[in-house]
C-alpha cells in the first residue's frame, strides 16, 4: 500500500549552483542521474529523496540504504503519494531475436528498453514525480517537476517511456561511459559496441582497449557469435521493407561468410551497406545523399536519444569515420566502403574480421529502424 504525506511546500526543483540572497537562481526541474554521476547523484538522493523517506511513518521501517525503488508523485499543494519497494516493474524491450511466450529473457537478448512501468500506478500529468530505481548495485534517479511552478507545464510526454530510456541507460551504463581515448582505439581497430555482440564480449573488448591492447582479441568470440546469429539475421532483413531490395544480395553475403570465402563476402557486403543506408534515408525524407548525410540516416530515421543502447550518435560517427573512411590512393591500408568500391583495398583486408564487422553494421542499422522488433 502506498503512503501519503504532506509537504509544507511542494518542491520546484534543485538549484543548479549556489547564489547569494537577491540573486537569480537557475532551477533544475527535470533530470536523470545515475551511478556514473557520482556525488551529483548522492547529493540529489540525500536531499529531497531522503526527506521523503524520513517523512514516512515509523511502521514503514524503511531506511534510505534499503531503498531498491521509490516512486513519488505530488500536486502543487504538496499532497504526495509514495511507493517504496512494493511495486512490480514491467519493462517493454526491443529484442534481438524472436522469443517464445514464457521464455527467459537475458541481457544479451535486449536491444533496448522502450518503457518501464510500475504496475497499478497512475501519475496525473499535473503532478510532479520522482523515481529512484536500481539495477543490482547501480542506482538511477529521475524527476520531473515541470508541472509545478515556475514552469506550470503539464506533462505531455509518456512518463513510462522516459523511465524506460533511463533504465536502459542504467542497464548498459558501461557502453555509455566509454572514454574518448577508448572510442578512438575502437574506431582505429574498426570496432564498435555492436548490438549483435553479447554484452560480455563488448565489455571484454572495452577492457582490452582500456589496457592499451588490441580490440581484435575478441575476434574469435565475435565471429562465433555472428555465425550463430546468421539464421536470425536472415529473418530480420527478410521482414522489413527497407531491406527488401537487398535481401537476395545480403543472403549471398551470408552464404559466402558461412563458406569462409572472405573476399566474396566482403566484396558483396561493403557496397551493399550503402544501398541499405540509401533506403533508410528515405524514411526521413533526406534529400542530399552524400556519404556524410547517409551516415546520419539511421539516427534520423530512428528518433532515438543518447540514452539508447544503440548509441545512435556514436554510430553515426562510426559510419562516417570508419565505414565511409577515405583512403590514400597511393597507400590504401584499410577496408572501407570507398576502398572496396574503388577497387584499391588489398587482398589481405578482405578478412574474416572485415566480414564479421560488415554483418554487424547491417544488424546495427536494422535496429535503428522504427518498426524493428
Each language-model region and where it sits:
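Terminal, compositionally biased low-complexity regions
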Residues: 1-223
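Amphipathic, oligomerization/interface secondary-structure segments
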Residues: 178-184, 188-192, 232-233, 237-247, ...
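Generic amphipathic alpha-helical segments used as scaffolds and interaction surfaces in large
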Residues: 209, 220, 224, 237-240, ...
Amino acid at each position: 500500500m502506498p503512503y501519503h504525506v504532506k509537504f509544507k511546500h511542494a518542491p520546484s526543483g534543485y538549484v543548479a549552483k549556489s547564489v547569494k540572497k537577491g540573486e537569480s537562481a537557475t532551477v533544475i526541474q527535470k533530470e536523470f542521474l545515475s551511478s556514473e554521476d557520482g556525488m551529483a547523484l548522492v547529493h540529489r538522493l540525500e536531499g529531497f529523496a531522503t526527506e521523503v523517506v524520513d517523512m514516512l511513518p515509523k511502521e514503514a521501517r524503511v531506511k534510505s540504504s534499503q531503498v531498491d525503488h521509490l516512486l513519488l508523485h505530488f500536486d502543487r499543494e504538496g499532497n504526495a503519494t509514495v511507493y517504496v519497494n512494493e511495486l512490480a516493474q514491467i519493462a517493454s524491450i526491443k529484442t534481438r531475436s524472436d522469443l517464445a511466450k514464457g521464455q527467459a529473457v537475458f541481457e544479451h537478448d535486449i536491444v533496448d528498453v522502450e518503457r518501464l512501468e510500475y504496475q497499478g500506478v497512475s501519475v496525473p500529468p499535473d503532478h510532479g514525480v520522482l523515481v529512484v530505481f536500481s539495477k543490482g548495485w547501480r542506482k538511477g534517479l529521475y524527476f520531473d517537476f515541470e508541472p509545478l511552478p515556475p514552469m506550470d507545464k503539464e506533462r505531455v510526454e509518456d512518463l513510462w517511456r522516459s523511465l524506460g530510456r533511463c533504465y536502459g541507460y542504467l542497464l548498459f551504463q558501461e557502453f555509455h561511459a566509454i572514454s574518448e581515448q577508448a572510442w578512438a582505439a575502437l574506431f582505429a581497430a574498426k570496432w564498435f559496441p555492436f548490438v549483435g555482440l553479447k554484452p560480455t564480449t563488448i565489455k571484454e573488448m572495452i577492457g582490452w582497449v582500456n589496457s592499451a591492447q588490441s580490440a581484435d582479441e575478441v575476434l574469435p568470440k565475435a565471429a562465433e557469435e555472428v555465425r550463430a546469429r546468421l539464421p536470425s539475421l536472415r529473418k530480420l532483413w527478410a521482414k522489413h521493407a527497407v531491406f527488401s531490395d537487398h535481401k537476395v544480395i545480403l543472403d549471398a553475403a551470408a552464404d559466402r561468410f558461412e563458406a569462409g570465402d572472405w573476399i566474396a563476402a566482403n566484396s558483396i557486403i561493403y557496397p551493399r551497406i550503402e544501398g541499405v543506408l540509401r533506403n533508410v534515408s528515405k524514411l526521413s525524407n533526406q534529400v542530399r545523399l552524400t556519404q556524410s548525410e547517409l551516415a546520419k540516416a539511421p539516427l534520423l530515421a530512428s528518433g532515438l536519444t543518447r540514452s539508447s543502447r544503440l548509441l545512435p550518435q556514436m554510430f553515426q560517427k562510426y559510419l562516417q569515420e570508419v565505414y565511409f573512411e577515405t583512403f590514400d590512393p597511393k597507400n590504401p591500408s584499410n577496408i572501407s566502403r570507398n576502398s572496396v568500391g574503388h577497387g584499391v583495398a588489398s587482398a589481405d583486408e578482405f578478412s574474416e574480421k572485415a566480414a564479421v564487422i560488415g554483418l554487424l553494421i547491417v544488424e546495427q542499422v536494422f535496429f535503428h529502424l522504427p518498426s524493428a522488433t
